[in-house]
């Protein structure tokens, strides 16, 4: 009795229509609808009313791991009515690198202790991503994560951009100051 068999090389054919994008574990189980959230629904209702009444800049603050980033992503996906799939990019200016994330609809800057505190680099990056004031239906969304780690000079730079480029939506996420 032969217990071994020969297996020829098999090619797996994927259907590109069914494989639109990779789904990570965290993306698969994150809340997608208002009812999926496990937090106070008043917060979600306020976000929905911000979208309905016209969007402005806002700051989401709280302790670690309470869902600030998830709320911001919910807001962006609800605002553009599409899922946001982000990719990692590198912005280079004067031999300094700044890593950021971008989707079709928005930009994300994740701040840590080692980046984003060089004012010329951040200013060049903001000049690169902000949209001038024009009459478009949707605004350009820029999400800044861990804003509490920024130096005061960089925060003042963001204030200038908030005042000057009002056709952009800045979402700041961080701990309370």
Language-model segments: residues:
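P-loop/Walker A NTP-binding region and its immediately flanking N-terminal helices
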Residues: 1-176
């Amino acid at each position: 009795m032969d217990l071994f068999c020969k297996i020829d090389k098999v090619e797996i054919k994927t259907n590109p229509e069914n494989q639109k994008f990779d789904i990570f574990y965290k993306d698969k189980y994150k809340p997608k609808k208002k009812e999926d959230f496990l937090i106070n629904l008043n917060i979600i209702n306020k976000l929905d009313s911000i979208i309905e009444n016209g969007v402005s800049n806002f700051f989401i603050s709280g302790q670690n791991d309470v869902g600030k980033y998830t709320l911001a992503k919910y807001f962006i996906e609800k605002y553009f009515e599409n899922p946001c799939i982000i990719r990692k990019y590198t912005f280079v200016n004067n031999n300094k690198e700044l890593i950021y994330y971008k989707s079709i609809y928005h930009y994300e800057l994740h701040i840590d202790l080692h980046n984003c505190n060089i004012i010329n680099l951040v200013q060049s990056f903001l000049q690169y991503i902000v949209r001038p004031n024009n009459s478009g239906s949707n605004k350009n969304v820029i999400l800044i994560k861990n804003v509490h780690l920024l130096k005061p000079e960089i925060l003042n730079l963001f204030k200038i951009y908030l005042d000057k480029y009002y056709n952009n939506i800045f979402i700041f996420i961080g701990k309370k100051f």
